[in-house]
Amino acid sequence: MNGQRRGHPPKPAQLDDVSKKIIEQLQADGRRSYAEIGKAVGLSEAAVRQRVQKLTDSGVMQVVAVTDPMQLGFFRQAMIGIRASADTRVLAEQLAAIDAVDYVVLTAGTFDILAEVVCEDDDELLELLNSKIRNLEGVLSTETFVYLKLHKQFYNWGTR
């Protein structure tokens, strides 16, 4: 387990101010050039490239394209709370294998697992719930929270 003791979280990465500024630059515009970032943070283009490579290789950050589901024809998003009678880790893996599921987290509280789904419409959501999710062995019950309007979605917690 990467040298960590069972049950203990990994040590958080120690980022210096320059690395944090590089991350902030990429969060503002993931296509910003290394030369532009270098000017903003006081490093050469090569130094920025090396730092970005180190940050991505270590898993501290990733640079990805984020799409708008509605622009792609997926008009129904929902969070599904799942109560389980089976090993939640196994159930989470099964949920993660479903194409319409884009987020799975084990939780403490009312639900054992939360899974976010993205569907074209309500009919697809209903089919997903009835034919796939509720049919998984160990699912006791589900509660679906349909999204009406997204008010905030940011990915900038990494430099606080």
Regions found by a protein language model. Give the residues of each.
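A compositional/biophysical signature of low hydrophobicity enriched in polar/charged and small residues
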Residues: 1-160
